[in-house]
């Protein structure tokens, strides 16, 4: 059954409505539950909108699957981000794109590092930005992944992997097959060749069903 129609971010064109089966939404959350090792003792700070795959499918579902707690805010505010993190004793949160820079642009305070954060899903993030976040807020661990509203999160960085900025990790081969293919023939290309990313799910309903018409 279709759980929701979620709209894409519109990166490559007009935003499209994606028909999301229940299992598709669940697996988004299970990715974070598994690779960020969310437990009942965690508190997730959620500022992204619930009509976005990150806000609803990744963060909220991941929290519910783990039986953890969540603090949901109506909007993201860089000026109050670290104060909320400290006030609610937050252990996990996501910073998407420019949000990293907005947070770092706020006046630094000695108390910034006095927080309970154990991991942040920051994507995409550069080496310089990751270093600044780690140094200022004493964040011990970062998570990155590659995904789309349509195809879930087929590539993610295992919890024990090094924090290499810009590295999405490995294929989550329990649920997905991924190849780099020739865009004209769909034939798999040798390692090092530039091509198109093709993703195929191994489980039923863990992918978009169709675009809404």
PLM feature spans:
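Gly/Ser/Thr-rich phosphate-binding loop
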Residues: 65, 82, 87-95, 104-165, ...
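Short beta-strand->loop structural element characteristic of the AMP-binding/adenylate-forming
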Residues: 16-19, 46-47, 68-75, 143
């Amino acid at each position: 059954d279709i759980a929701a129609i979620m709209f894409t971010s519109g990166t490559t064109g007009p935003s499209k409505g994606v028909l999301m089966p229940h299992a598709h939404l669940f697996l988004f959350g299970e990715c974070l539950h598994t690779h960020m090792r969310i437990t009942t003792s965690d508190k997730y700070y959620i500022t992204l909108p619930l009509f976005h795959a990150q806000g609803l499918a990744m963060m909220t579902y991941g929290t519910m699957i783990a039986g953890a707690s969540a603090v949901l805010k109506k909007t993201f505010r860089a000026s109050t981000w670290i104060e909320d993190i400290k006030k609610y004793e937050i252990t996990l949160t996501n910073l998407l794109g420019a949000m990293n820079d907005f947070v770092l642009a706020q006046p630094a305070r000695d108390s910034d590092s006095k927080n309970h954060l154990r991991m942040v899903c920051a994507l995409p993030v550069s080496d310089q930005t990751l270093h600044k976040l780690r140094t200022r807020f004493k964040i011990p661990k970062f998570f990155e992944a590659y995904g789309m509203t349509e195809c879930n999160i087929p590539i993610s960085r295992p919890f024990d992997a090094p924090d290499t900025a810009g590295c999405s990790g490995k294929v989550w081969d329990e649920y997905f097959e991924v190849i780099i293919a020739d865009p004209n023939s769909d034939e798999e290309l040798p390692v090092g060749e530039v091509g198109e990313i093709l993703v195929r799910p191994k489980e039923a309903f863990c992918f978009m069903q169709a675009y809404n018409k």
